[in-house]
């Protein structure tokens, strides 16, 4: 299954991840104070040299060669796109409403396989693709093709970091693992035709086979000394127990019946027969699949002896570095640079909060009881649509559905998540909201800004309706997508939303600092080797009772290495570009134009975006 089919917030947002036939994708679309005066900081330069293409051929020769090269690249794009989506029925269904229109008529498996062998084949295919990409003469391609080529080259360079480290892959995790997210995808498997129902039932019936593959992979990890700790295993097992459904009345049965109701011309007898088959598939395959995982993982207890973060494994530091770059697509050159930048961002934002509280002591009492103008999800979405018109380009009208996470799954899933629409039908957008009281401290207004307008839904629909490359539409770079959502979430505190403007500024700075603290701990635990005592000591600088949260924070970082970084580092990259543009353009800076540039770029690693940002900035200076 493609990574990041579900886009969500930082508490548990990202990955359903397995090998691909062609191995193209690291990620595919899928989801968190002291007393001194603020110091003005010039942002670190975040521009890269613009791309330059050299070609000395004559005009007639260039035109002929260009046509051939462009056609060759177009064929490669089509081939990659079709290969990726034909590898698994589940991915294909979520990404294309009408696959036949893209030349795809069959798939290799209900769900893409999970195994070390499949991952090794992925790496080999990626090396072959990397070699093929290097054969293109960039100067002869169209501008859009050049961008796609550069994105693919960057992606393949990052993926090469994981060569030989296949057994470090983590398909299971408490809230962002396959076992936690797959049921929600099944609940949203749209029935356009009767055949879709048959395909869905085949996937459910395949689930025990698929989870058997995952268990075999975990057993291979254990034999290699790479198994997760018993603490992490307990978290995953607890997640699995949420899906031991009660027969006859559960969310999987209810959602199936609701989707059947959307099918026209289905007789009552056919409906009853399909419902009976679904209940049988759940009882005979879905629940046994989770029991298989639970029993198998229980037997693996004691095989995982690493109680530290990722760096506690033999090559864990190298694998974590790969995770950092694949999750962020960052333009920073080293993890040490990321640590420094994260520390600086935390400090800058805490200085802002300190200055605000010092200059406006009344804000302290406001923090204890504040309210947004809108509190209902649909009203918040509509207000945000209006609020964003000033600084963001207008999105064509699109439909969306807001749903609550099933009560039985609240403890196993993120605070909220967005299910992306098919690339050929942007009308299907679903946002799930987790109503569990443990998330009451996360204001719904900002959560919906992250997931809806101007966050994931807005950015995804914009890209689907403005990008001509089908291949690019199925590539997802978490640093860009989650970075964008975290960036606009922070902005949402300062909209005209019913809050006192100074309070909004305070909450925005505090949210950025808090996310930064999580990101720093992610790096410190998984790269520097911090233990729980180190985490508690670090937290004591920011929280009055660090002992009460140090344990859970440490375990979260161990369970989900690099998860927080896509949110924080991605949003930091965007803020750095904005600060650079504001500094160099002065009064000529236009937020809507800056956001339009980023939206038009779409999903891409920041090392590529930076070079295009340099060109955009030069054009802005010249008034173009």
Mark where each language-model region is.
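Intrinsically disordered, low-complexity, compositionally biased regions/tails
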Residues: 8-12, 16, 27, 62, ...
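Sec-dependent signal peptide recognition
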Residues: 21-27
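N-terminal maturation segment of proteins
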Residues: 38, 48-624
């Amino acid at each position: 299954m493609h990574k990041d089919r579900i886009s969500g917030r930082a508490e548990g947002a990202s990955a359903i991840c397995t090998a691909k036939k062609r191995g193209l994708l690291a990620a595919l679309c899928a989801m968190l104070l002291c007393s001194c005066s603020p110091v003005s900081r010039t942002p670190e330069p975040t521009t890269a040299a613009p791309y330059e293409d050299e070609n000395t051929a004559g005009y007639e020769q260039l035109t002929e060669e260009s046509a051939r090269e462009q056609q060759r690249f177009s064929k490669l794009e089509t081939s990659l796109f079709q290969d990726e989506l034909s590898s698994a029925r589940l991915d294909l269904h979520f990404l294309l409403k009408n696959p036949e229109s893209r030349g795809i008529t069959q798939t290799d498996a209900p769900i893409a396989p999970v195994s070390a062998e499949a991952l090794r084949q992925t790496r080999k295919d990626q090396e072959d693709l990397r070699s093929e990409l290097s054969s293109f003469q960039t100067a002869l391609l169209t501008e859009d093709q050049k961008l796609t080529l550069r994105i693919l080259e960057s992606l393949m360079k990052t993926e090469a970091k994981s060569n030989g480290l296949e057994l470090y892959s983590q398909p299971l995790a408490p809230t962002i693992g396959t076992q936690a997210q797959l049921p929600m995808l099944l609940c949203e498997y749209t029935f356009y035709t009767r055949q879709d129902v048959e395909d869905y039932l085949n996937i459910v019936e395949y689930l025990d086979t698929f989870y058997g593959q995952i268990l075999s992979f975990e057993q291979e990890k254990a034999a290699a000394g790479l198994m997760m700790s018993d603490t992490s295993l307990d978290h995953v097992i607890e997640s699995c127990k949420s899906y031991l459904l009660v027969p006859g009345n559960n969310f999987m049965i209810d959602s199936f019946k609701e989707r059947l109701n959307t099918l026209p011309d289905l007789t009552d007898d056919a409906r009853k027969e399909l419902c009976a088959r679904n209940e049988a598939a759940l009882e005979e395959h879905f629940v046994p699949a989770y029991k298989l995982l639970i029993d198998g993982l229980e037997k693996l207890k004691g095989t995982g002896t690493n109680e530290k973060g990722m760096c506690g494994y033999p090559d864990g530091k190298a694998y974590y570095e790969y995770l950092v770059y694949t999750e962020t697509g960052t333009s920073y050159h080293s993890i040490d640079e990321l640590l420094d930048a994260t520390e600086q961002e935390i400090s800058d934002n805490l200085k802002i909060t300190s200055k605000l509280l010092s200059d406006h002591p009344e804000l302290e009492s406001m923090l204890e009881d504040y309210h947004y103008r809108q509190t209902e999800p649909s009203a918040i979405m509509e207000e945000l649509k209006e609020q964003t018109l000033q600084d963001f380009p207008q999105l064509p009208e699109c439909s969306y559905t807001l749903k609550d996470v099933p009560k039985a799954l609240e403890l196993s899933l993120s605070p909220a998540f967005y299910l992306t629409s098919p690339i050929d039908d942007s009308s299907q957008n679903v946002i799930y909201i987790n109503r569990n009281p443990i998330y009451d401290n996360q204001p719904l207004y900002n959560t919906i800004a992250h997931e809806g307008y101007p966050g994931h839904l807005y950015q995804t629909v914009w890209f689907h309706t403005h990008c001509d490359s089908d291949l690019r539409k199925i590539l997802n770079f978490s640093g860009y997508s989650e970075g964008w959502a975290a960036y606009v979430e922070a902005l949402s505190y300062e909209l005209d939303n019913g809050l006192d403007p100074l309070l909004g500024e305070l909450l925005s700075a505090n949210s950025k600092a808090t996310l930064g603290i999580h990101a720093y701990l992610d790096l410190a635990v998984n790269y520097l080797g911090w233990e729980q005592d180190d985490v508690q000591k670090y937290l004591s600088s920011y929280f009055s009772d660090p002992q009460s949260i140090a344990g859970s924070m440490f375990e979260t970082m161990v369970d989900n290495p690099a998860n927080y970084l896509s949110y924080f580092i991605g949003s930091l990259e965007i803020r750095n570009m904005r600060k650079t543009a504001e500094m160099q353009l002065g009064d000529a800076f236009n937020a809507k134009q800056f956001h339009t540039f980023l939206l038009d770029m779409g999903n891409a690693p920041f090392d590529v975006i930076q070079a295009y940002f340099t060109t955009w900035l030069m054009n802005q200076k010249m008034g173009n």
